[in-house]
Amino acid sequence: MPLQLLSQRLEKTQHDGLYRSLRSVERTTPQVFVEGRQALLFCSNNYLGLAEHPSLAQAAADAALQYGTSSAASRLVSGNQPLHAMLEAKLSAWKGTETALLFNSGYAANTGIIAALAGRGDIIFSDRLNHASIIDGALLSGARLIRYPHNDTLALARLLEQHQTDGLRLIVTDGVFSMDGDIAPLQGIADLAEQHRALLMVDDAHAGGVLGQQGRGTVDFCGVTGRVAIQMGTFGKALGSFGAYAACSRLVRDYLINRSRSLIFSTSLPPAVLAASAAAVELVQAEEGQQLRQQLTDNSHLLRYLLQQAGYKVPDGCTPIVPVMVGEAETTTRFSTRLLEEGVFVQGIRPPTVPKGTSRLRCTVMASHSPDQIQQAVAAITRVGRELGVL
């Protein structure tokens, strides 16, 4: 009977056009094989192309040979190794904070940080389009969750005025929003946090390595360095490695070490990952990192311009996330399938990841894409869009 219930629920998912399955993708380069079919990759978060960079691969290999393949314990037992402290020091110097604390993934970081900071009697103010891990962290915390309209600082100000508490008030926002590629108005949000004595946390997963001086992210890009209590970032996107971190004060770090369950009850990141991440942090601050960021920006502008010229209502912007709105989930799935047949791999994004009626192709561009590859992708998106009546 229990399995029959699961089967019925899965059948409904299929009926609603929301069924998901896994596809095998070889490597993260612009040209890949997807289940044996050659295609241009336009849905990877490998923004700077560092996942294939030889310096990261060499650092990982050297660390595995020197330290082994696993930390074999949580950091509070015996899994706190010198490489953890080394990487945290590099992170805090890069992000301009007192210190930093590593987590095993962006999801583990957001759920672990938010559920540790807030609890009953506290209030969390979250942008309506924040990542699911932020929402899940808020729900796990037991705090009251108030979601404000997307990037609307006037609405946030009203909500902060209306909802007082003797406990903690925490404002959480994405820096770059993962489905639309737009940037949070951090100047205004930081002003409100200070005015209303609230903590401010920014999820900078999609901006680290991409925006700001030396790729420091949206906090630097928006000019609010020193005004954000917690900067959450990841290594699995522009930095080409794996894991996540909180760049913060020593007080917040100590608090999280004692309260964050996703940190306390997880085996810590392995040596190879730590070394690769450290190499990436160094690289994005160097001249090569600046060159890659410029190429990424140029490619983002080219992709947006060509899609706009084709007739798509694509927003202007400087981030590598470029949404092509489709609408219905079933049409989006067909669009993605047809694109793969045309030699372009772009995943369709459907509910619950995005609201109903806003399904889309989430195109992402990399620094390693050539102008010709971008033109090929747009030509295919244009052909299929006309075929399906989207364009």
From Swiss-Prot:
Its EC number is 2.3.1.47. Pyridoxal 5'-phosphate binds at G106, Y107, S178, H206, T234. Substrate binds at R20, H131, T353. GO terms for biological process: biotin biosynthetic process. It is an enzyme of class 2 (transferase). It catalyses: 6-carboxyhexanoyl-[ACP] + L-alanine + H(+) = (8S)-8-amino-7-oxononanoate + holo-[ACP] + CO2. Keywords: Biotin biosynthesis, Pyridoxal phosphate, Transferase. Pathway: Cofactor biosynthesis; biotin biosynthesis. PROSITE patterns: AA_TRANSFER_CLASS_2. HAMAP family: BioF_aminotrans_2. This is 8-amino-7-oxononanoate synthase. It comes from Trichlorobacter lovleyi (strain ATCC BAA-1151 / DSM 17278 / SZ) (Geobacter lovleyi). The lineage of its organism: Bacteria, Pseudomonadati, Thermodesulfobacteriota, Desulfuromonadia, Geobacterales. The gene is bioF.
